[in-house]
């Protein structure tokens, strides 16, 4: 677990005695533990997330960098049963096309297809799902890619802040298939749906990450 509850905020960092270099090293170690320790979890306990923890997780997202400081995000945290039921119902309408995509992508791993479809039917029992939208529907073609990246950066912040609190997460892109319906229902007047973060207390041991090779170069 990310050492130090809320360690991303300077005021709550438990600074060790010693030089400024030692203090800096401790902060960096905690941050790297969070980055490397976070995993996607797809099965959750029924325990609700305290409202104050959810607020802090969202606030962490709002601290993310954004293109031209536009802060082009709008987040909707679903916690009510009727809202979650609506989400699951809309995702059900896209299940067939989603399965076809997964079968093409994982043709040698059919178990992955089945596991994913089972997860998508009820998001692993999560009681809290954050939908990430663009704040406006009319960003220019030049700005749009950067605005999408900005929302993604905020969502990553939320995943790390959740991990800091012992709360598991899973970034889900499949919700965009039902983006029009979800946007009309939950975010009228705002922009397109970029993705979702599923939150909860883990009820499974996540798989280790298998990193693909040759994905960067230092010159």
Each model region followed by its residue ranges:
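Small-aliphatic-rich amphipathic alpha-helix that forms the alpha element of a beta-alpha
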Residues: 56-57, 61, 128-130, 136-184
């Amino acid at each position: 677990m990310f050492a130090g509850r809320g360690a991303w905020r300077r005021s709550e960092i438990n600074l060790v005695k010693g030089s400024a270099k030692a203090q800096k090293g401790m902060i960096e170690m905690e941050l790297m533990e969070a980055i490397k320790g976070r995993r996607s979890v797809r099965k959750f306990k029924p325990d609700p997330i305290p409202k104050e923890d959810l607020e802090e997780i969202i606030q962490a997202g709002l601290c993310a960098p954004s293109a031209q400081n536009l802060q082009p995000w709008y987040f909707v945290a679903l916690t009510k049963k009727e809202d979650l039921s609506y989400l699951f119902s809309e995702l059900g309408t896209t299940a067939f096309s989603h399965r076809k995509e997964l079968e093409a992508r994982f043709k040698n791993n059919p178990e992955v297809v089945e596991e994913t479809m089972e997860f998508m039917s009820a998001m692993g029992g999560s009681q809290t799902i954050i939908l990430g939208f663009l704040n406006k529907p009319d960003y220019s073609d030049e700005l749009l890619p950067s605005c999408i990246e900005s929302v993604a950066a905020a969502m990553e912040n939320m995943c790390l802040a959740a991990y800091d609190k012992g709360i598991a997460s899973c970034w889900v892109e499949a919700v965009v298939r039902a983006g029009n319906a979800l946007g009309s229902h939950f975010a009228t007047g705002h922009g397109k749906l970029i993705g979702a973060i599923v939150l909860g207390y883990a009820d499974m041991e996540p798989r280790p990450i298998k990193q693909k090779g040759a994905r960067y170069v230092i010159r």
